[in-house]
Amino acid sequence: MKVDLNCDLGEAFGNYSFGGDNQIIPLITSANIACGFHAGDQHVMNDTIKLAKDNGIGIGAHPGLPDLQGFGRRNMDLSPEEVYDIVVYQLGALNGFCRIHDVKINHVKPHGALYQMGARDKVIAHAIAKAVYDFDPTLIYVGLSNTLLISEAQALGLSTASEVFADRRYEDDGQLVSRKEADALITNTDEAIKQVINMVKFQKVITKNNNTIDIKADTICVHGDGAHAIEFVTQIREQLTKEGISITRLGG
């Protein structure tokens, strides 16, 4: 049994610093690198790719909506054509820096509101997946487990990785509880680790309404920007290892 640990990185831009990329990157196996629309800029993208390469982890594109002020977490009324174009644009930007470092993009994971829109809207999900497929059909597509993100990508023939979240609560339909709700995040480390093991080992998760639903876990999203993020991810790694679960990069 194996699983990937992924984290969103490269979210600083200009004079704005964000996250602890240098501290978290030795603990993960895949990096989702912001491509300049919701966060990141050309210098940060360049530096983050080099950091990921030096640590031997999978490099992923993390395209988001063009909304720096809202960190890409606010929905936008976009046509499928607009969604397609913003995804291709960001993949091209990241790929340019990958080429100068002689590395390849390994996977793609939509960010924030784009991710949530795709999980719920078949047309948007198809537009995102089609952009990825047309750019490079060999890329691994990361999406929320058991949602349209995964099914639309698979329908096009993309390899997919079903994603679960260590520190997020779930609705009964498998969607994530909205960040607008007070109980959306799991702040207790023991509870989060228990949820991770349950999802990876038994393919189950307990929802916010205390119901048990099926879930597929190919990759676990962890975050590097919390007060206890490093300790949290370290404990997750240790517990996965104790359970006999190998931590391996996507496609590895």
From Swiss-Prot:
It is an enzyme of class 3 (hydrolase). Its EC number is 3.5.2.9. It catalyses: 5-oxo-L-proline + ATP + 2 H2O = L-glutamate + ADP + phosphate + H(+). One of its GO terms (biological process) is carbohydrate metabolic process. The keyword ATP-binding applies. GO terms for molecular function: 5-oxoprolinase (ATP-hydrolyzing) activity; ATP binding. SUPFAM superfamilies: Glycoside hydrolase/deacetylase. The keyword Nucleotidyltransferase does not apply. Keywords: ATP-binding, Hydrolase, Nucleotide-binding. Pfam families: LamB_YcsF. PANTHER family: 5-OXOPROLINASE SUBUNIT A, UNCHARACTERIZED PROTEIN YBGL-RELATED. HAMAP family: PxpA. Forms a complex composed of PxpA, PxpB and PxpC. This is 5-oxoprolinase subunit A.
